[in-house]
């Protein structure tokens, strides 16, 4: 059984540390599209 050190995967590599705030927001983008569907349908009157 291979043991994986998840602590290594918990942080971005040093070269990408500047992008950490962006990476934190990326998982939320699909939720914004999901909510946009309801806003769009409300705008067109739920046809």
Swiss-Prot record:
What SUPFAM superfamilies does the record tag this protein with? Photosystem II reaction center protein K, PsbK
What cystine pairs are annotated? Answer: none
Statement: the UniProt record of this protein carries the keyword Signal: no
The membrane-spanning stretches of this chain are 26-46
Main location as per UniProt: membrane
Positions of the pro-segment in this chain: 1-10
Instruction: Look up and give the membrane topology term.
Output: Single-pass membrane protein
Could you tell me which InterPro entries the record lists for this protein? Answer: PSII_PsbK (IPR003687), PSII_PsbK_sf (IPR037270)
Task: Report the subcellular localization.
Answer: Cellular thylakoid membrane
- GO biological process: one example: photosynthesis
Example of a GO cellular component annotation carried by this entry: photosystem II reaction center
Q: Known Pfam families for this protein?
A: PsbK (PF02533)
| Role of this protein | One of the components of the core complex of photosystem II (PSII). PSII is a light-driven water:plastoquinone oxidoreductase that uses light energy to abstract electrons from H(2)O, generating O(2) and a proton gradient subsequently used for ATP formation. It consists of a core antenna complex that captures photons, and an electron transfer chain that converts photonic excitation into a charge separation.
Q: Which NCBIfam families does the record cross-reference, listed alphabetically?
A: PRK02553.1
Oligomer status and interactors: PSII is composed of 1 copy each of membrane proteins PsbA, PsbB, PsbC, PsbD, PsbE, PsbF, PsbH, PsbI, PsbJ, PsbK, PsbL, PsbM, PsbT, PsbX, PsbY, Psb30/Ycf12, peripheral proteins PsbO, CyanoQ (PsbQ), PsbU, PsbV and a large number of cofactors. It forms dimeric complexes.
PANTHER family in the record: PHOTOSYSTEM II REACTION CENTER PROTEIN K, PTHR35325
UniProt lists the family membership as follows: Belongs to the PsbK family.
Q: By what name is this protein known?
A: Photosystem II reaction center protein K
Chain's gene name: psbK
